[in-house]
């Protein structure tokens, strides 16, 4: 589904992403892990098109997207959530999701019209709210949601584009155990119908969710494989996981 060929990015003399080859297969939850500063978020930005690459190719569904704009990648079926929550904080949950649906469909939208006048737009927004466990929060202002609820809303914004591949950049960042549990369950539900490329530091979540894992260290992929193989890989343990996860 997604294939990266020798993808690279430099910032001055620093090589943030170094000739990365990566394949994400349709239907999988593919986790990308690595220490802080490994280049994970930069790599996600290159895939999403919010940052230009210096070298290499991005192939998605047999189309080359390397030099396309972010909106063209969204139209092709790529959606992204961010490491730092990115929502319309002054709008309600319903209006956030309706805006995302409208952006995808191109239908007209006005906050000054009654809800009933927008019909299907808000029906779909409510369905997405239910999908991300925010059905009872549709009237709440986004800024008043808990951190975990805001992250779930951001995932909902990504789902509103009807993606074929979702890029999730540390969706559990800053969450407590209960919020993390809910996010894991949400990603499990998403992964049943949408391919997911997941960047995450919570190793318990990664090993529960991922069908395959790639390890990025100093901008390079050092290993890719099933969770059991990654857990047992001596090079991975030395570089990232730690000997305590070897058992």
Please annotate each region the language model reported:
Residues 1-247:
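Glycine-rich phosphate-binding loops of nucleotide-dependent enzymes
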